[in-house]
Amino acid sequence: MSSLTAAPPVPRPVRAAVVVWLLAVGAGVAETLVHLALPDPPGPGALVKRALVYAGVVALVLALPSGRNVVRWTLAVLLGVVGTASLVVEPITWLSTGASPVEYLAGAGGAEIAVVVLRTAHLAAVVVALVLMFRPTANAFFRRPT
């Protein structure tokens, strides 16, 4: 005799985290597209690398509702730590040279402003998604046996 048990419903914070992670990916893809309009666009190799990274991220994000804790922690480490570092190293390095954000923005064109807005949205989405993945109901969901 076998017994079938229904999978518990995916908690709202986990569902919201999926949406917010996908928004982060969308912001990253949009930023890449905007970079194509700038004087030093990414080359074919960089575009392929980014496409593979984004495809892998989307696969992980879509696996999040499965409740496997390893998926949650993989997202937290790869995107929350490594991905965030990749987003902030360039601006921090630029600021460390004494550059002025006010002067930059005053002289920036539409594409440069779009990059700043998209990068900021990307970072904000990562932070929100991380918080959502570790809300109490999400923690309980990921602790259950799978």
Question: Residue locations for each model-derived region?
Answer:
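Topology signature of small-to-medium multi-pass alpha-helical membrane proteins
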Residues: 1-146
